[in-house]
């Protein structure tokens, strides 16, 4: 896929901002049902994008390099998160951090938002080798075989959730069908109607593991794509910039979301939490970009992610 799909960058912007918002403990505690709704679709959509954009038509050395530069930042940040969880009183606090516990979290059961990269690495590995061995199968046969392999990995090794893997598989199916992204995920203002009905009438189905979760993910993507053409050029540039740099936010946002806990007393006068949310999200995004710019200028990015620059500046 040579041409960048800007609609995907826009969707990534929307979902990464929602991720940051509801990783803010104050916001999540104040609006628990909204958090449940957002958790139904935001990372599910990222897995769909990852499956859709995955390119497995490459040699083993190039693929190994790709996996290496996914694993290195994952390992660094997950290691830091695990150590932090053993020190700070966070919800995922580890009471007794041992080497066995550390290795378990790093290789098998990651903590924090880094589970996404862990899942992605596993899915890429399985997808690559199935593609190398069975690429000539029909679309249906290939996707079924890949699904069986991913299901086997999830059930026998218990290192990924099959609920999450299914969204990656959906992205692969969409990509290999050779149909345009917006032909499958059609922009629609009407998508807000069934979405609202699900939220009001079926709160128990708000889980990414349910059929309703799949439908909700599709509806939110569809509605968001309907909004995209109406963005002003300035808003669009900002959104696409954020969308192209979601990896930086995923990697470094936990550092800054913890700091935002200290902001709560200053916004106690606002019962809606809107001001707290706006300031905190801007702080987290800005902090992530500052870290990345410093890494780029010091030459750390080359050793951290295999690229001279981790920060991507869109060329429109």
Residue ranges and their predicted role:
Residues 1-316:
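Alpha-helical transmembrane segments and their immediate juxtamembrane cytosolic regions
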